A protein has these predicted regions:
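Conserved alpha/beta core of the MobA/IspD/sugar-nucleotide pyrophosphorylase nucleotidyltransferase superfamily
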Residues: 1-3, 142-184
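Short aromatic/basic micro-patch
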Residues: 106, 135, 172-173
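Conserved nucleotide-sugar donor-binding
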Residues: 131-142, 176
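Nucleotide and nucleotide-moiety/phosphate-recognizing core
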Residues: 1-130, 138, 160-166
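Glycine- and other small-residue-rich loops at beta-strand/loop junctions that grip anionic moieties
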Residues: 100, 133, 171
Length: 184
């Protein structure tokens, strides 16, 4: 399984790069990468050029890719990560992919394990509302690779939702107030 962390958003409402906010004593991007690595994943991080030096400082010896057109949309950011994977992983074309938005760190280790074991496109849900991370199957990855960069992901895949008890599943770090709500 492959993994990509989407960290190329403009963070306009937050007023600072989401990937670099302090989260449990370290940059949020470092927190997420270390959690994913503890489950055997080697995430590719896709970010903006303006913060790449800071991201690389937080993540030495990790794979970090610059999205040269981050305003084109989330699918375009995901495509940047996919290109990196296809260029460096021996040309393997079919793989499952875990997609982790940097601003959605509220999933539990149990939820992550369920995603890693899943054999269908899926995402966790709490109280009937879908959350993140998102697990894509090879056919979903193929559709994303050939889509326009501004195509909404919801038009390219239809994840099955599985209910979880993660108290912070819907934590979405978009504003300074959201940082105060994080109790992960």
């Amino acid at each position: 399984m492959r993994c990509v962390i989407l960290a190329a958003g403009a963070s306009t409402r937050l007023g600072q790069p989401k990937a670099l906010v302090d989260f449990e004593g370290m940059p949020l991007i470092q927190h997420l990468v270390e959690r994913l690595e503890s489950h055997g994943l080697e995430p590719v991080v896709v970010t903006r050029a303006e913060i790449v030096v800071d991201v690389l400082t937080a993540l030495p010896d990790r794979t970090v890719v610059i999205n040269s057109d981050p305003d084109a949309g989330r699918t375009g950011t995901l495509q940047c990560g996919l290109r990196q994977m296809l260029d460096t992983k021996g040309g393997e074309q079919a793989f499952r992919l875990l997609v982790v938005p940097v601003d959605r760190p509220g999933f539990s280790d149990e939820t992550l394990t369920r995603l890693l074991d899943a054999q269908e496109c899926c995402c966790p849900a709490k109280d009937g509302r879908g959350g993140h991370p998102l697990l894509l199957m090879p056919e979903d990855v193929g559709r994303i690779r050939s889509a326009a960069p501004d195509t909404p992901l919801r038009e390219l895949c239809s994840p099955t939702r599985f209910e979880v008890e993660d108290e912070n599943l819907h934590l979405n770090i978009d504003t300074p107030d959201d940082l105060g709500e994080s109790d992960v």
